[in-house]
């Protein structure tokens, strides 16, 4: 399995769309889309990573 990276430059954003493109984070939480995931990455000081695209 190749590591999948998400470019979170330009985050955090104050508001995310309701778009549903689930991402599973390394904390075993399903984020509804890249925006929500990237905001969480910034909040975690970069410790949160992407496990895989899709629901955990």
Curated annotation (Swiss-Prot):
Residues 6-56 form the Kazal-like domain. The keyword Disulfide bond applies. InterPro entries: Bifunctional_prot_inhibitor, Kazal_dom, Kazal_dom_sf, Prot_inh_Kazal-m. It comes from the Eukaryota. Keywords: Disulfide bond, Glycoprotein, Protease inhibitor, Repeat, Secreted, Serine protease inhibitor. GO terms for cellular component: extracellular region. It is found in: Secreted. This is Ovomucoid. The keyword Signal does not apply. GO terms for molecular function: serine-type endopeptidase inhibitor activity. Avian ovomucoid consists of three homologous, tandem Kazal family inhibitory domains. Disulfide bonds join 8-38, 16-35, 24-56. SUPFAM superfamilies: Kazal-type serine protease inhibitors (SSF100895). Glycans are attached at residue 45. The record marks 18-19 as: Reactive bond 3. It comes from Rollulus rouloul.
